[in-house]
Amino acid sequence: MFRAYGNNGLKNPERISGENPDLYTQTRAAVQQRATTTLKRNEKQKLAVQNDSVFQQVGIGESDSDDDNGGVRIRMSPHRYIDPDDVFTLPEVKKQNALRDAKIAARAAQATAYNTFPSVKSLNGCQDPPETSQQSTSRKRSASNSRSPSRSHSRRYDRDNGRQRSRSREKKRRKKERRRKRSSSRSSSSSRSRDRSSRARDTSSHTLMKMNKPAKYAFLTDEEYRTCDAYISSAFITQTKSDCENYTQGVPKKEIAKCRLSVKFIVGLEHNNILFNNIYGAEYARDKENRPFWEQLDRYLKDVPKETFFRYVPPVGGYWKIRDRVDLLNLDHIDDDVLANDSDNRKDAFTFELEQAKKTFSENVHNIDALIKVISMEEEMCRRNVGSFSSSNPAALAERHQEMVKKAIKADGRNAKLRLMKIELLIKMDPNSPTIIDDFKNLTITFPHEPMVWIKYLDYIQYDSNVYNYKKLKNAFEDCIRQVTGLTNGTLLSHLNAVNDRPLLRMFHLWIYIRYLKWMISCAHTPVVLANIQATFEYNFGLADVEKRTSTNSKEREVRLEEFWESGLPRIGDEGAVGAEKMLKQSEELSDEDIQKLENDDFDILISRTEETIATCLQAQRDVQISWIEVEREMMNIDARVKRTKLKDCELYEDHVDDLETCELWDIIPFDRIRYYEAPGDCANFDFVQPFLELLGVKFLNSTNCFTTTEQIISDWISNDSTVNFYKTPTYTEKKCFEVGNNILKFMLYNRLKLTENNPEYLDKTMVKYLLAMLVTEASEQEKKLNFHSFKLNLKNLVGTFITKHPDIFKRAMLSKITGIVYMEKFVSWWERALKEQEKVVEADERRKNYKEIKMEEGVVDDVKFDVILLKKDKERVQTIRDKIRDMIDIAIPKSTEKLIQSADSSLPTLQLHLYANVLRGRLSILNQNALEETRDVFCKEILGIHTSEFESDEALLLALDQGLNELLEHCKEKDNLESVDSIPELPRAEALCEALKVVAVFVFLDKMAFSRRAVDCLIANAITKFEQFEAKKNDFNRGTYEKYCDQIDLKFITDTLITFFSHKKHRFIYNENFKKLIFQASQAFPCDSKYAKMLGELHSSGRLQVMKLQGFTDSRNSILNAKRDQQFDPELETRLLMNSLTIMFSWMNAANRIGDAGNQILYKNWKREAANTRDPAIWRQVIRVASKLSQKILKDDAYTRARGQCTWALNLHFDYIEAKTVRKNGDLMEMIYLILEQSMGQEHSLFVTDEEYMKTQQEIGLQYSESGR
C-alpha cells in the first residue's frame, strides 16, 4: 500500500493473527487497549508531577540540595499543584494547543475505530478498507445490505432516530432545500438524477465514517524520509496545486509543484543556523519549539533585555540582579506588595521606570523634569514599537504631548525647556508649518540667554533643505551673535540677571561665532570669513591697549575701526600690518594714490593667475563640466584674499578688462557686512585667539580640535604612507587661509615678545604657546612632503631655516632650548613612523612574492608590480638619521655628569628639559643594542650617580634603579609644588616627565627582568589608575582651568610614551591586549584627539567581527552624546560625534579593502549612516565618492539627494557630485549652474564663471591652438 494514502499518513496498526475475530473478541481488545492507554498516561503524568516540582533559587555556587542548580525541592500536596503550562502559557497558545490535540485525537479515532457495541457500524482498522465511495443522500435502504445478528437492535436504533427527525421535520426540510439549491447550481437536473441513481447502486450496506484525506506529500515529513538520499527531494517539493486553466481547456489535470525553502542551513554552517536565520528568517515558517518546562524557564531567565535607545536613568537594580521567585501557591494571602516584589508580575526595567515617571508626574503636575522625562520615554517607547504588533502613531503621540506641554506652560510660562519642547512637538506634527520660524523668533527674544534655544533655531534652518534660505540663516546667526555679545559685555541689561553660568555663555558666544564662520567657508565665502577674522583682531589687538579696554569705550573703538577699515591700509593678517592704531599714525602723510599702490602687486598676481587658470582649464580638450569645476576650484583660492581697495580702480584692470568682465570676482567687503567678535571686557587671557587660528589651519602643540574644520581633520588623518585612507576633500582655500593665519600668529608672537623684552628670562605662557604653535605648524608642513619609507630628511636645514626666519627668538637661551627639545621630539616621532612604514613595505613585498611564486607553480605568468620598493640604502639612511638625532639631543641638552637631584643647576625648567631629553634617548635606543647599553648607562648616571658596570648583578641594578626613580619622583613632586610658577608652559610638568621616564626604564631594562610581563602589566594598571584620577580631577570644580589643562598635557605625554613602545614590532604582538586596553582608555579620556581615534580604528579593522564590536561600542557612546546634545550645550559634543564617526568609517574602510571592490556596498551603507548622524558636508563628500563606484543611480537618487537634503549650502558638495557623474548629457552643466544659483539666492557671490557661450568660445580657442600645434 502506498503510505501517502493509507491511514492518514500514519503507520497501520498491527493485525490480530488468525481468522477474523468475532464481536466478543473485538470488544475485549478495545477495552484492553483503552485501559492500557489510560494506565500509561497516568503513570507518565505522575512521573511528570514528580519531576516538575517547584524549585526556589536560594543561592549561587555549590549546594547540598536535591537540585544540581542549587535549588531545594519542595513537596506539595496534589490539590495545591498547578500545571506549569497553565501558569506560564498564554491563553491564545492554550487555545491553539487544544485545537491541535483535538484534531490529532480525531484522526487517531478514525484510524483505529472498533465496534465496541454490535449495533454501531464502524470501520475496523485491522481490516482492509473498502473501496471509497460517496455516501447516498437517500433515506432508502440499499439492496446490497446484508443482514446481521443484531438487526433488531439496529431497527430500534433507526426508529429512535426517526422519532427525533419527526420532531424537527421543518428544520430538516429547510436544510434539504438549501442543499438542493447548492447542488442545482453545480450541475443540471438530468446530471443530478443520474448521479443519484449511480450513488444508490454503489452505496455500501455499512454506515461509513467520513475520513479526512491526508495531504498527498505528507509522508515527506516523516522521520524515515529524513535520510541523505531523500533529503534533496524533500528540500523543495512540499505542496501541490492543480492547474485550473489546463483543466477548463480540456487538458488532463496537471499538478504543479509549489517550491518552498526547506533546507534551513548554509553550506559549511550545518550546525550553526544563526546566520541563515538572520538572512532568510522571514522567508520560511519556523518549526515550533517543543521544550520541557524547565528548559523554557531557564532560557527566559538567561534572556537579558537590551536597550535600543539611550535612557537618562539606569535600569532599576541593574540588568544582572538575581531575583527570587515568590511562592504564590503557599501564601495565605496575596496583596499588592507581594505582587510588586514578584519577578513574574514585574515589567521590564524600562516599562517599570516609565510607570514610575508617570506616577511622579501625576503626584505633582508642576514637576517640569518629570514631564520632560515622561515625554522622552514615551517617544522612546513609540520608537521601540515601530515594526512590532503594537500600535505606534508618532503624530498622535506628539499631539497628546503637546497638550500636556501647553498645560505645563500655563503653570510655568518662564521655562525655556517647555517652550522649546512645544516647538519641537509642532515640528513632529507638521514639519512644514509656517508658524515654526515665528515661534522660534519669539522664543529667542524671550530667552536670549539660553544656548539651546539658539542651537535648535539654527539647526532647524540649516539642516533642512525645505526650510533653508541664505538670508534667513544669515539673519539668524547675526541676531544670535548680537544678543549674546550684549549679554557677555553687559550691554543687554534686560536679561543680564537671567544668566546663571557666565563662563558657559562666553564659551557659547565663541562657539556660535566659529560655527557661523564654518558655514560661510562651506558656502565658498572665504573672503567674508577672512574679513571678519581680520576685523576681530584689529578690534581686540590693533586699537589701543587691550588690557585696559572696558565696555564704556566700545563705541569709540567701533568708530575708530570703521575709519581704519575704509582707509584701505594693511590689516592684521596682511603682509606688513602692525595694527590699526599704528597704521593710522603712519598713513597720515600718505595720499589715496599711495594707498592704492600698496595693493598693486597683489592685483597683478590676481589678474595673471586668473587669466592663466581660464586659459589652462577651459581651453583644454576635456569635458566642459570637468573644466568648469577646475576653474571654480582654482578661483576659490586665487580670489580668496580680502581686497582693501576696488580692483576696477587699479591701473592694471583697464588692460585686462575683456577677460575679467566675464569672470565674477569678489569686490571689497564693506564694514557694514562685517560681524567681528568682541571679546568680553573683563577677559584678559584671550582664549579666543587659538580657536580662530586653528580655524585658519594653524597647528598648536596642545589642540582641542573643537574649532578646526572637518576637512582639516581628514587631511591630518591622511598620512603619507601605504595605509588605506580617506579621500581628499579640501575646501580649496586652505593656502590663503593658512597664509593669513600664519601672519596673524607672527603678529601675536612678536607682540608678546615686545611686552616681555624687559624681562627676557620670564617665560610668558602666551608667548611660549605662540612660539610652539609656529614651530609645530612649520613642522607639519614639512611632514606632508616626507616619504617615510625612504625618509630623506635634512635635519640641520630644517632647524637652520627656522632659526633664520625667527632670529629674535633664539637670542633668549631658554626659548632656544625649548624650541630645540620640541623639534627633537618631532624628529623622533618621524623616525618611528619611518620604521613602521618600512615594516609595512617589507610585509607587502613578502606577500607579493608569495603570490607570484604560487602563480608560477600553477603555470601562470603574472607580472606583479611593486608600488613601493624598499632599498638597502633606505634602511641604512634610517639608522644614520637616528644617530644624528641623538647627537642633536646631546647638543641641545647635554648629559648630566651627576645625579639630577644633586645637580648644581637644579631649577625646575632645567630638570624638565633633562627628563624630557632622557625620554627621547630611550625611545631612540629601543631597537639598537649598542644604543641601548649607552642609554642604560646614562640612566644610571643621572638617576643613581654611578655606572651600570659597578653593579654585581642585574637584580641589584634593577632594585637600585627602582629606588632611585621613586626618590626622583618625590623630588619632582616637591619641585612642582614649590616652583610651579617657573615651570615651562605647554610642556609636561616634572612629575609627569618622571612617570614617563619610569615607563622608558622598564622597556630599556626589559630583557634583564625575570618577570617582564608582570612589569608591563603593572604599567598598564598604573596607567588605567591615572585615567581614573584624570576623570575625577576634570570634574572637580575646585581645580582651576589652567590646572586641568596641565593635567591633560601630563597624561597625554605618559600615554604617548607607552604607545610608542607598544607600537614597535617586537612588542606589538606580545603585549597586544595591553595595547588595546591603553588605546581604549586614551580614546575615552581624549575623545576629540584624532590620533587616538585613528589608532582605535586600526586595532578594530582586521575583520568584520572586530568592526562590529567597535560599532556597538561607538553606538553606545553616540547614544549618550546625542541625548546630551538635545538637552545641554557642550562645545566638545559635535567634535566627539565626528571622531566616533571617523573611527567607524576608517575601520569599515580597512575591512572592506580586504575584499576589493566587493566591499564598496558595505562601505557605502555604513558611511551613509555616519554622515546622516554628523550632518557634516565633508562626510557626505566621502559618501559621494564611494557611491560613484557603485552605480550612477545610487549616486544620484540616494547619496546626492540625502546630502543635498541636509547640506544644500555646501558648494563643494555639488562640485563633487558633478565630477563623480560619468554619464553626462548636454544641458547637465547649465542645469546644475541654475540649481546652485537658485539655492544661493541673496548671496554676495556664488560662482565665478556662469556664461555658457564664454566657455564654448574658450574651448574653440583651445581647439584651434591644438590644431595649429599639430
Curated annotation (Swiss-Prot):
Keyword Nucleus: yes
Subcellular localization: Nucleus; Nucleus speckle; Nucleus, Nucleolus
Protein's UniProt name: Nuclear exosome regulator NRDE2
Signal peptide: none
Family the UniProt entry places it in: Belongs to the NRDE2 family.
Coiled coil: none
Highest taxon in the source lineage: Eukaryota
One Gene Ontology term from the biological process aspect of the record: regulatory ncRNA-mediated heterochromatin formation
Segments of this protein annotated with the region Disordered: 1-22, 119-209
UniProt entry tagged with the keyword Nucleus: yes
Residue ranges with Basic residues bias: 164-184
Keyword annotations: Nucleus, RNA-mediated gene silencing
Entries under Pfam families matching the protein: NRDE-2 (PF08424)
Compositionally biased region (Basic and acidic residues): 192-204
Species the sequence originates in: Caenorhabditis elegans
Disulphide bonds in the chain: none
Function, as annotated: Protein of the nuclear speckles that regulates RNA exosomal degradation. Involved in short interfering RNAs-mediated silencing in nuclei. Functions with nrde-3 in the nuclear RNA-mediated gene silencing (RNAi) pathway to regulate gene expression via inhibition of RNA polymerases I and II during the elongation phase of transcription. Required for exogenous RNAi-induced H3K27 methylation.
